[in-house]
Every structure is written in C-alpha cells, then in structure tokens.
A protein has these predicted regions:
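Extended, well-ordered protein cores
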Residues: 1-168, 172, 178-185, 229-531
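Contiguous, function-dense segments enriched for cysteine-driven chemistry
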Residues: 147, 205-209
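Extended charged low-complexity segments that act as oligomerization/scaffolding linkers
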Residues: 193-196, 201-206
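Extended acidic/polar, glycine-enriched regions
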Residues: 211-214, 240
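Internal insertion modules embedded within essential enzymes
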Residues: 214-227
C-alpha cells in the first residue's frame, strides 16, 4: 500500500505542463485559484534546467531567440514539508473566480468585498477559506463562501467572472444593490437557479447566461463584447474580436496546453560532444578555457565532471565550427535540419538505425515480428530507455491547439502568452524518463488500405465533420489540418494498443502516452506510418 502523503495543493511537474499550467484554474478545498504568469514567479527558485538541443531550437523557431533558459519546476526537498521555508516555495496562485456566494443565505459578493472575510492558515491550506461575515440566516458562526461556478471566456484566451451586475439588470446599471443566488430546485440546474438584486428587484434566471438555446432563438444575457481580460497576467487587452461564451468552472475546454515535446535522440560524435550540444545555450558564450571553472562552480555543467577544462573547451570550439555533435547519430545521418520538424529525426532514428542502440538518453533494440503480423508490420523496436523533453510555450481556451505542436496560423493567433513582457526570456519545462514500444507499419499495406473505395467514402465523411467543426468556429479554410485516414488508422490502433497494454502489463492507462508518426508519401519527410 502506498502510504506517501501529499499536501493540499501539491502538483506533479508533469501536471504543470499538461493539466494545471500557467493560466489554468485549480480547485482547492474551499475556493479556486488561477496559476499566475511568470512575472509572479520567484525566479531565484528556478535553478535546474532542461538541456536538449532540439527542444531549444524548436522553441526558438516558435518564440524567437529571446528564450534563453527552460527551467524545471522547483520541487521541495526539505525533510520537513511543513516548514515555513518549504511552504513559501511553489507556483503563485490568485483567487479566481473572484465572485463567491454564501450557501446559507445566497448572498453573492467579490472576494475583496466588505462582507467577505478571508481565513488564512499558513501551514494548513485546507483550512483557508472565505467566510460570509454578515450572514442573516446562519445560526452561529460565519458560513464558508463557495465560488460562483460560472465564467466567461473567448477563443482568444480571455477569461473572467460573469458580470453579474450587468447580467441581473440586463445591461449597464448604476444600481449597487446586493445580489442573491436562489435555487428553486434540487438539481442545481441553470433553469432552476435565479440571480436577484435585493435593491431594485431585478432578477434573471441563470440559464440566460447560456446562449444558443431553444433552437438558437435564445440570446445570451452576457455582454456581446469580450472585455479582453487575462487574470493570470493582471492585464486586459483592448479591442478583442472574440465572442464571449459562458463556461462552467472546471470545464475541460477552459485550458489547453501548448507544449513543444521531443524525444532525445543520439548525436554524432563523442559523449563530450553530446554534452556540449545539450548545454550549448550556456556554453556559447565561452571564449577561453579560463572561464570554464566559473561555469563549474555555478552548477552549469552537470555531467562534465570527468572531463578536463581543456577537453571541454576543445569540444566547444568543435561545436562552434560545425564539426561537433549533430542529431541522429545512431545511423540517422539524414536527420532533418528543420528545427520545426520534431518527428522526422525521431522517425529516422527508430526506422533506419542499426539493430541495437545504446546512448545515455536512448536505448533500444529491434525485436522479431510475430509470424501473424509480418505482412502488416515492418519493424518492432523495444525501447528500454528514453528521455522526453518538454517546454510549455502557451495555452488556448475553448479550442484545442491540436496534437504534437502541429498548429496552423489560426491556432498560433489564439495562443495565450505566459508572461506580460514580450521580451520574457525563460520558460518552464520538464523531462520524462521511461520506456516504450515503437511499431512501424508496412507502408504498402497502409497505402492500399487508404485507397480502398469504402475508406475513401469514410474519409469524405470525416472531412465533412471536420469542416463543420472549423466552420462553427470561424476557422478558414474549413478543410485545413484534416489529418487523413492514415492518421485516423494509426490513432485508432494506438488507443486500442494502449488499452490492451494497460490490461496486460499492469500499467495505469494514465501513465501511457502515444506518439504518432503519420505522413503521406507526398508530404515532406514522408511517408511515415508508425506509433
């Protein structure tokens, strides 16, 4: 039995990349909060970095060379997890949504309102709460207020509380009366909930916050113009052209991560050449051997301990002249030099390498193909060791950015920044170490399957649904980014295989991730058909 105890509000580094990153909303026992932008982070706590040359090149291709460092999320190391020092570390959070309500009397108020009191407890986050100080219905004590679980968001990443004063008064109003939340049913459905102003008597049912009802005849009662608010940046954009939509607190479409992810592949050259390539962001400023001891003392040269200063400087000069390490060393001499093409070097490494590869980041060997599958599968690779490097570069709301960083201009326009400053120079990242199975399918069989008339008809159905999806979101052209039946085949196989792997090997399904290599013969770097 796992007896490890977790603190309230504790997150794994991987969760900050995919589930609860900057701009996302996290539920605590008594309220919710939003992960703040990088200006609010304690930069002094960020020391360990993610070193992977291909990852940095891919980030630079998307955000520019201003990004100098990719830091790992700090992890508390104190033996006493409840010490003041350890409790002062972590990821900054602000209360969001700010509108709260009393479950006893229904009074609604913002967190800073005079009727709301904050109960703080430095050592017990589960005891932190907002109390209604002037509840007229509570018999003894001050009830704990809970978040009003309705928000407004737009496809350009803005999010805010519903303007409840506007909502109740059905437009702009000078009325400052208190608002009350009233449930008339037992289900808590929006049709059975009403918001009322006690001063002027105006009221509005909660269902009015959601448009497109009654066959599209019901108009939303929220403002038609997005206010452009980014609470994680403490900033408001002007002139947002997005259409605000009401969402529920905790909705899965309130935050989608945009991450750049690569598998570390072997590099040509010696071990030292590979280390220099991985740490080039720090080493490109080294102009003579005398500066290397300072880099050692600053902890910027992990893994270099067995090499002398002269050896390190010689490797730096080799790399600077272009004679050092390059990706794809394990038999992948044709690895792509395009830093935005993240899959091609990996595909070449797994499909064109020798039968066995041993590297500090990647170890794999080719396995025999079962007789029943030799016609369909070209290669099976058992990956005993791999390292995946990731960097969070932004996020979207309402619209998912898609799989594996292959975004079009529409999605890039909707990417929400992680910091206010356009000159911000660092990101957060993560490294995952694990194992895996690579399967390369027979290209001729995949191509023949895709060309069947029944599959072509199915492809037309998928394309029609894909175009309708993009049309509803005003994304042009409507048929852009359609993955094709090749990808659908590989994706379907991948999920079926992961499910069976979880059942047969004892892995948690959440611990298994897929990586799909799908390109048609005419695509750059194609064809690819593997998982």
């Amino acid at each position: 039995m796992n007896r490890e105890k977790f603190k309230i509000g504790e997150l794994r580094p991987s969760q900050l990349m995919h589930s609860f990153g900057v701009g996302s909303i996290v539920d605590f026992p008594n309220f919710s909060g939003i992960i703040m932008g990088f200006e609010d982070w304690q930069v002094g706590e960020l020391r360990a970095q993610v070193y992977e040359r291909r990852l940095r090149e891919a980030v630079h291709a998307r955000l520019g060379p201003r990004i100098k460092n990719i830091y790992k999320v700090p992890v508390p190391v104190s033996e006493n997890p409840f010490s003041r020092e350890e409790n002062s570390k972590g990821v900054p959070v602000e209360v969001f949504p700010r509108w709260l309500r009393c479950p006893v009397c229904g009074r609604m108020a913002q967190a800073h309102d005079h009727v709301v009191e904050f109960q703080s407890d430095f050592y017990s986050p589960d005891r932190m709460k907002f109390r209604h100080a002037q509840c007229t219905k509570a018999s003894g004590g001050r009830p704990t207020m809970i978040p009003v679980r309705r928000l407004v968001a737009c496809e350009f990443g803005h999010i805010d509380d519903v303007d409840w004063v506007y909502f109740v008064h059905q437009g702009e109003s000078d009325c400052k009366g208190p608002l009350y939340w009233k449930d008339y049913g037992v289900t808590g459905a929006a049709e059975e909930t009403e918001i009322e102003c006690k001063t002027c008597g105006k009221k509005q049912k909660l269902i009015a916050a959601f448009g497109d009802g009654d066959g599209g005849k019901r108009k939303s009662a929220i403002p038609e113009q997005c206010n452009g608010h980014h609470p994680h940046l403490r900033h408001t954009d002007t002139g947002c052209k997005g259409q605000p939509r009401t969402i529920v607190l905790g909705a899965s479409n309130s935050w989608f991560s945009m991450t750049v992810s690569v598998i570390a592949i072997p590099v040509e050259g010696s071990e030292l050449d590979g280390l220099v390539a991985d740490h080039w962001t720090n080493l490109n400023g080294v102009i003579n051997v005398a500066t290397i001891p300072a880099f050692r003392q600053g902890g910027l040269l992990p893994g270099f301990e067995k090499f002398s200063d002269d050896q390190i400087f010689a490797a730096i000069e080799r790399y600077r002249s272009g004679a050092g390490a390059s990706p794809g060393g394990a038999g992948s001499a044709n690895a792509s030099s395009d830093s935005t093409d993240l899959k091609l070097p990996e595909w070449q490494t797994f499909t064109k390498s020798r039968e066995r590869v041993e590297d500090r980041s990647l170890s794999f060997r080719s396995m025999p193909i079962p007789d029943d599958f030799k016609a369909d599968i070209s290669r099976i690779v058992r990956v005993d060791r791999l390292r995946e490097a990731q960097a969070l570069i932004g996020f979207t709301r309402l619209l998912s950015p898609g799989e594996f960083g292959e975004w079009d201009d529409d999605v890039n326009e909707m990417r929400v920044p992680l910091a206010r400053s356009k000159d911000h120079s660092w990101l957060i990242g993560n490294e995952n170490k694990g194992e895996g199975i690579f399967i390369q399918f027979n290209e001729n069989r995949v191509k023949a399957w895709c060309e069947q008339s029944a599959i072509q008809q199915r492809s037309a159905d998928f394309l029609r649904a894909h175009a309708e999806f993009r049309s509803r979101r005003n994304l042009e052209p409507n048929d852009a980014l359609f993955p094709g039946m090749r990808y659908i085949l590989l994706h379907s196989f991948s999920h079926a295989f992961m499910r069976q792997l979880a059942l047969s090997a004892g892995y948690s399904h959440a611990a298994i991730r897929e990586r799909i290599y799908s390109r048609a013969p005419g695509d750059p770097g194609g064809p690819m058909a593997g998982v």
